[in-house]
């Protein structure tokens, strides 16, 4: 993964974002999720050995690795091991996790390893505040699931597969 023989291009030296999704399993059905309504919620997990190979191949990568996707990565049975592998001492990249925070209390020490932590919540502002007390350094985003399209304001595009609203253009 060093350099393309024809072009000389090396992805490792390019700033950017790599998204790692280690499970398709999620414990919520958030209306802002990119998963479609019929997306299967399956107990399938990336093997930690494959994850390790992927991470070590990125040893010289200098961008951001985003630990998020179409599942809640903290539900992976080897979440702690994956976080440890992701944060090996030789890494040059930054890490970010985006989570719904429902496993935060039990796994706080793993979440604290990330350079950027984003907690999404749509239950209530009170639940968000509870999570904020557990992990104050995280960015907490509250999404009101009951908000109607006419209340969205002038945002040009809204994507919300869970609520069956696709690409609303103002």
State where each predicted segment sits.
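Conserved alpha-helical substructure of the radical SAM core
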Residues: 1-113
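Radical SAM enzyme [4Fe-4S]-AdoMet core and its adjacent flexible, acidic
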Residues: 21, 41, 46, 64, ...
